[in-house]
Amino acid sequence: MSHHRGLTVAAGLWPTFVVVDAQDRAALNTALLPLLLKTWEETSTGSEHYERVAHNIFAFENPAVLALKTIVLDLARRHYDLGDAFELEGHEIVSQDRQFIKTHVDSEEGDLTLQYFVRCPAGNAALAVNQFGNAAFVLVNPAQPAGSFRFPNEQHHEYPVLPRDGLLVMYRSYTPHYQCPYQGDAPMVQVVCNIKLKRVSH
């Protein structure tokens, strides 16, 4: 005679790991800003963020860019084993008044993505980082797409980060994200950095 024993398993699967790193990087931003604005003017082909000539700022032999590269890779290596077989690509994002970024993922460009904020709304610096507001950068739970139902005991779908000068956000590239509308006179400037590990062919 066989006996059947019941089994119940509950597992919180697939968490998303996010790092928010806010430091005083005023000197770096002062050096980066004119270079990024100049590059944007030379490569932008339209009013939308994606309308641009493809380029990689990390190919520039510029001291400020090299300093940013060091910061980005140091933070990434602090949390992930990158090894030596990877590529780092980055480009500037310049936002004008009322401009925003729609929900998307960066998994075609990288495995690990970092957003570095160079010039942000001045009022954001006095506010808490984890909240919505002017040009808030928002990460969306990849297991619960925007618009899906959330039970009261489930975590929120979204994690907002309020940009400020010198702030870095690091997340896996498959994580959906968007940016709320920016309000301001001077263009907002940030750099998106994608780290893509090289695949081993068998």
Please report, for each region that a protein language model flagged, where it lies by residue:
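Solvent-exposed residues in well-ordered beta-strands and their adjoining turns
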Residues: D21, F117-R119, N194-K198
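Non-heme Fe(II)/2-oxoglutarate
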Residues: M1-L82, F100
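Residue-level preference for beta-strand/loop junctions
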Residues: D84-F86, E108-G110, P187
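Short, surface-exposed beta-strand/loop "edge" segments at domain boundaries and coil↔beta transitions
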Residues: A27-L28, A146-S148, S201-H202
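Hydrophobic residues positioned within well-ordered beta-strands of beta-sheet architectures
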Residues: L88-G90, L112-L114, V189-C193
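Catalytic core of non-heme Fe(II) oxygenases with the double-stranded beta-helix
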Residues: H91-M170
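A short coil-to-beta-strand element that immediately follows conserved catalytic motifs
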Residues: D81-H91
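Catalytic core of Fe(II)/2-oxoglutarate
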Residues: R150-H202
